[in-house]
Amino acid sequence: MFNEITKSVMWNGQVLEISTGKIARQANAAVTVKMGNSILLCTCVVANKVKDGIGFFPLTINYREMAYSAGKIPGGFFKREGKASDREILVSRLIDRPIRPLFHQAFMHETHVTCSVLSYDPATPVDILAIIGASAALSISPAPYLEIVAASKVGLINGEFVLNPTLELLKTSQLDLVVAGTEDSVMMVESEAHLLSEDKMLEAVKFGFESFQTVIKLIKELAKEAKKPKFEMQDLYPSSLKKEIEKLFTKEVEQAFEIKSKQERSTDLALIYEKVLTHFVRDIENKKYNNYQIESALKAISADILRNKILEKNIRIDGRSTTDIRQIACEVGLLPSAHGSALFTRGETQSLVSTTFGTSLDEQIVDSLEGEYKERFMLNYIFPPYSVNEAMPMKAPSRREVGHGKLAWRAINPILPNKVQFPYSIRVVAETTESNGSSSMATVCGSSLALMHAGVPIKAPVAGIAMGLVKESNKFAVLSDIIGDEDYFGDMDFKVAGTSSGITALQMDIKISGIDFKIIQIALEQARLGRLHILEQMNKVISKPNSELSKNAPSSTTVKIDKDKIKDIIGPGGKIIKEICETSNAKIDISDDGTVSIYASDRDKIKIALDKIKAIAVEPEIGEIFNGTVMKVLDSGAFINYLGNKDGFVHISEISDARIDKVSSVLKQGDIVKVKLIGFDNKGKAKLTIKNAYKDHSSNNTKQKNNVKDDSESEQRRDTSKKRTWNEDNNTEMSEVITERKYFT
């Protein structure tokens, strides 16, 4: 019944198996990829005909994580997989980027590649298996997929590179790098790094590239036995068409590329295109040529002009040399109500960035195959149509926006303080207000500025730069700080972000084969010099975090209570904690180890909540002194309320050393007095003294002592890297707590 073909190889100590012919047999191509207990189904479907009027290659990649693959039922009301998660979008892009450049340039059949995780093993990198599976499916499909791609993941632990590290190992790794490529060259790199050098990053790319060569051989073996006949392809346009356009319109195109302004240049090129269409109107009517062929030929001529000018004259569209960076302008504090803000402008690319602080309650909850976890740092990249002068409606975040936001997140995340140093959740919003290349790297620069303006104690400023490449045979030029046309007509988009001492994020997409490691090394070094220049310009505006937080930022304090008292603070059904939150207007976060974090808009609200928590959590000891309120006066003494919810009795003899005939002559209901706990009667009721409390307080200047340890006197509107939570018993700094938390508002 099944004509199954299976190929396997030992890869990094595990069996990698790729098979076809058993599942999804009606698709043009389908493979299952297995490693450990992970199983992925990767399919490819290619439309038989090209849609009328289409002028691009409609390739769609969808990566799906099925909840059942990890033995889970999806959350939410409908209990089924819905729209793609950010993780699924990011992996879909990871698959797309090395594969898309390898199709025949004239191929325009609608193509869908779907990779579904059917069984999930956290010890295997399913994103890497998805790239391998997609490449294998395409290799046996009718699509003109020109070269085979494979991928690997690289970690750096204890100074050693680790191939395909598990999620657990990645927690201690200095590097999380994905590299994909063909037998001859690297096609794509995506990474987050903890301030690694250019040389170390290049070593990691080489390590990953060499590691997946075994997988390419495996896919070739499968394709040799299982591949289907490929579509026969013709040239994108007749060479005679290009020659005729060159003869008639080359000078006009050259003049257009002398214009430095993006908008003016685009307008001129659009007019030239209309002239070309008018010239060939009869040929179009006679169906000798179509609009797309004419447009493609004109773009090829534009590319030749731009590329030759760079290679032969070392001059770019805007007049810069290959290493020049566009003019930079930085500004902070534009938005007075935001906790931090910055405007970063580089040439015709601009990013307006804001920083907002929140509490633990504001952390992003992420539901993944590994389980639910929380993200304390969030970065949202927004690319509105007006940034490129397009009249389009604003929509939900696109895949591109999700991908660019994650790249900027990777660049910033390694330099953020931990939760002990800075207890807030952080949201950065970067809106691209102008775009002409490298908007994601402008986001990185603007985010660094906004975080420092907000007072976040980051380890060092971060900047990003996008590098490009023009390569013809043995001649090549690496371009610093590319603009949009250089990205479009060039051969590489290579983004590098980092501090003055090392790289934090790297993303590389190559559009042609034959890029060797020498070129990558040159690009990395040129990017380092460009990054240092950008950091120098940024540092002129702000070079270190502000010592104080914005007046609009929430205040916070952390206290430590006995774990046995957590239930008393929460109360039945959360009654007590809700009452505290309502009366104080504060938010309270209680950890299982007894750490209580309190957040509010000002210190007065925090004090109200803190006093109420102390009142419940404190177990008074004999000899301690408290502030108390006279609740009731009797002939024999007075009842005193202290610590908010505790009562005691002061006998008339303990009120004063002087003789008192009538208690009401000395104390009245509502009076605030100092009291000292001197013992308990046989019913457990507290016995208090006023006279000794005042004696001890004045003689020893006794400070109230509670078994609640807090830093409530430490104002959070300052350099929060100096914030400490102390345990008075041993005077050691409390370590960061990573536990399940209980949240109340």
UniProtKB/Swiss-Prot annotation:
Residues 707-719 have a biased composition (Basic and acidic residues). Its EC number is 2.7.7.8. The keyword Signal does not apply. It is found in: Cytoplasm. Signal peptide: none annotated. It is an enzyme of class 2 (transferase). Residues 554-613 form the KH domain. It catalyses: RNA(n+1) + phosphate = RNA(n) + a ribonucleoside 5'-diphosphate. Mg(2+) binds at D487, D493. Its main location: cytoplasm. GO terms for molecular function: 3'-5'-RNA exonuclease activity; magnesium ion binding; polyribonucleotide nucleotidyltransferase activity; RNA binding. GO terms for biological process: mRNA catabolic process; RNA processing. Keywords: Cytoplasm, Magnesium, Metal-binding, Nucleotidyltransferase, RNA-binding, Transferase. Transmembrane segments: none annotated. Involved in mRNA degradation. Catalyzes the phosphorolysis of single-stranded polyribonucleotides processively in the 3'- to 5'-direction. This is Polyribonucleotide nucleotidyltransferase. It comes from Rickettsia prowazekii (strain Madrid E).
